[in-house]
Amino acid sequence: MLQPKRFKFRKMHKGKNRGLSCDNKVNFGSYGLKSIERGRLTARQIEAARRTMSRSVKRQGKIWIRVFPDKPITQKPLEVRMGKGKGNVEYWVALIQPGKILYEIDGISEEECRFAFKLASSKLPIKTIFVSKLVL
């Protein structure tokens, strides 16, 4: 699973997920999967989508993951009374704003890429669209 190797503080405030994403252009590959909704992706969801894409692409193309889960989500155990401090870190999430590029692919045809991204988007809890790199 994806998670930071080192971090300054183990636990974080919940915070807000406002604004639009700056990572809205395809940088590395030819095609990208772009979010059009706000939400959170867990490390498991990111990995599940990556696996489905890599199975679909096989060994032809190259896949880039443009999101990283760097926010810890804590949870208290079941049937524990309130108080006594914040719970333990249960999993890690990446906060997603509209317009963020989640994955990129290069080295395969557009039809294969669309099919791979369709499979990957079914594993994700947010709505996404297919985008291609603008070549001028």
From Swiss-Prot:
GO cellular component entries: cytosolic large ribosomal subunit
Gene Ontology annotations of biological process type: translation
Domain of life per record: Bacteria
Residue ranges of the TM segments: none
GO molecular function, one term: rRNA binding
Reported function: Binds 23S rRNA and is also seen to make contacts with the A and possibly P site tRNAs.
Family, as annotated: Belongs to the universal ribosomal protein uL16 family.
Assembly behavior: Part of the 50S ribosomal subunit.
Name the UniProt record assigns to this protein: Large ribosomal subunit protein uL16
UniProt organism field: Buchnera aphidicola subsp. Cinara cedri (strain Cc)
